[in-house]
């Protein structure tokens, strides 16, 4: 395993051939059975957005695929019989899936090794909590209260496949790997026309790697230029020095602004800046003038258009003034709230009052959008009035109840950090009454008669799971009081928003 890892280590003096272990089975066997790369899983999870796709990866299937490739020589593809070739036909989607997944596994290794080397000597045991979605909000509470403006940026996707190939070319210098990579991309587009109407069965590992490499390239350039605006001779981002014609591209990019580069650096210089990215969006918080925040806005527009050749409209970059506007981020509406405090001070026989203003980040639930989502899924109407879920009446009573309890628990779990619980209680009320109406419709009864027959024990099911969790976190005296329902609670075990959507 050390030999394989040593082969994959980045070395500027030679070209990396990523396809070598793809065509030599002994290296595939090492990848399939050796657990030496398991120590990189934590590092890889930091590099990738979602690590849940590893559950669908089968090393045995990959081994059998490699054997069939050797026996049938399927990689020799005549261009005349491109559509008739069984490797590229409708029945060969499985082969493409596994080859693309295997290619992503191989290409991920050097990136994980290099990223893991940057974390040497640092403790990563607490990184699991940092992967939680809720871990972002305590950071925002601590930082955004001291800033004036927030730049909300929607990260664009490349509209042409060659942009993805060129992005990967900056880091992978092996021509054969890039040609194979381009082949996989274009074949995916050909198959997409046939399989777009069906449920997608493509493994997302390959495309998650593409997305993360695309975002990594954008962020590395942004941080590099950001560092140069504060420290002109900084060389902390050594990963950028291995690119092809990097300085030529940067020099061309800077001409977009003006020739007077020191003046631009002086205008963009801002030591008080914070950057957060999640789910295809990023926010840039700063404490400065509107002129500077507008310059950052057009910096992002020119970065995407000039460097990545992606048409990027300026309306995709929103400037929010926290004291006036709401920042919509990860399902919450955040804004700054001024809390006046009056302090009475006494010195000897004289007493006086001191007026203080405390700035606090207010996180609210977007009740309108949530009611719209519930109405779209037929839990209520557009006004928020609960209705019965007609499509669930064929299920058993316990199944219906468990579904509603799980949905209510997930929503309560995620929006426990809201500063105002009134909207959360309204959502719970909609789900509870929808559950009762669904059960009453199944038994062909009215809601009043159904509740009278079963009693109040039915609605207690919605409170059991959440109360058990909170009772383990807080002391009994604090839990028994009503203060618990007025505080914000951030959980550090919410890793995916899909868990809330799929109710798993």
UniProtKB/Swiss-Prot annotation:
Protein name as it appears in the record: Maturase K
RNA-binding as UniProt keyword: yes
GO cellular component labels: chloroplast
InterPro entries linked: Domain_X (IPR024937), Maturase_MatK (IPR002866), Maturase_MatK_N (IPR024942)
Organism classification: Eukaryota, Viridiplantae, Streptophyta, Embryophyta, Tracheophyta
PANTHER family per the UniProt record, alphabetical: MATURASE K
Keyword Chloroplast listed: yes
Compartments reported by the entry: Plastid, Chloroplast
GO BP term, example: tRNA processing
Name of one Pfam family that matches: MatK_N
């Amino acid at each position: 395993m050390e030999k394989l890892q040593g082969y994959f280590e980045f070395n500027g003096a030679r070209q990396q051939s990523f396809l070598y272990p793809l065509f030599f089975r002994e290296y595939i066997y090492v990848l399939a059975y050796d657990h030496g790369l398991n120590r990189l899983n934590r590092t890889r999870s930091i590099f990738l957005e979602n690590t849940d796709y590893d559950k669908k990866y089968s090393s045995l299937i990959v081994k059998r695929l490699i054997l069939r490739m050797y026996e049938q020589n399927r990689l020799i593809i005549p261009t005349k019989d491109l559509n008739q070739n069984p490797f590229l036909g409708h029945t060969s989607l499985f082969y493409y899936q596994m080859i693309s997944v295997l290619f992503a596994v191989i290409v991920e290794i050097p990136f994980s090794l290099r990223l893991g080397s940057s974390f040497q000597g640092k403790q990563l045991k607490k990184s699991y909590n940092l992967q939680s979605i809720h871990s972002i909000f305590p950071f925002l509470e601590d930082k955004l209260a001291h800033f004036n403006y927030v730049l909300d940026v929607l990260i664009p996707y490349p509209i042409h496949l060659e942009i993805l190939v060129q992005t990967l070319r900056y880091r992978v210098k092996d021509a054969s790997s890039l040609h194979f990579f381009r082949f996989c991309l274009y074949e995916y587009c050909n198959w997409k026309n046939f399989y777009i109407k069906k449920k997608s069965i493509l493994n997302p590992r390959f495309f998650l790697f593409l997305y993360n490499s695309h975002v990594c390239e954008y962020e590395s350039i942004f941080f590099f230029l950001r560092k140069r605006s504060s420290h002109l001779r900084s060389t902390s981002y050594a990963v950028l020095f291995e690119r092809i014609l990097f300085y030529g591209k940067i020099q061309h990019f800077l001409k977009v602004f003006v020739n007077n580069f020191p003046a631009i650096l002086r205008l963009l210089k801002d030591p008080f800046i914070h950057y957060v990215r999640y789910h295809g969006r990023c926010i840039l918080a700063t404490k400065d003038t509107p002129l500077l925040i507008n310059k950052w806005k057009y910096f992002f527009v020119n970065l995407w258009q000039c460097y990545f050749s992606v048409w990027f409209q300026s309306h995709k970059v929103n400037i929010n003034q926290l004291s006036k506007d709401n920042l919509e981020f990860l399902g919450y509406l955040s804004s700054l709230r001024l809390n006046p405090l009056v302090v009475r001070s006494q010195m000897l026989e004289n007493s006086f009052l001191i007026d203080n203003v405390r700035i606090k980040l207010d996180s609210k639930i977007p009740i309108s959008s949530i009611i719209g989502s519930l109405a779209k899924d037929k839990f209520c109407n557009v006004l928020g009035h609960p209705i019965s879920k007609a499509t669930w009446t064929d299920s058993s009573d316990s199944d219906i109840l468990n579904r509603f309890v799980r949905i209510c628990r997930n929503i309560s779990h995620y929006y426990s950090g809201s500063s105002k619980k009134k909207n959360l209680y309204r959502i719970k009320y909609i789900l509870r009454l929808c559950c009762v109406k669904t059960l009453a419709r199944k038994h062909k009864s009215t809601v009043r008669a159904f509740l009278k027959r079963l009693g109040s024990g039915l609605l207690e099911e919605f409170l059991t799971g959440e109360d058990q969790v909170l009772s383990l976190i807080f002391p009994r005296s604090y839990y028994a009081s009503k203060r618990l329902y007025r505080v914000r609670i951030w959980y550090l075990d919410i890793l995916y928003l899909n868990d809330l959507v799929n109710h798993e």
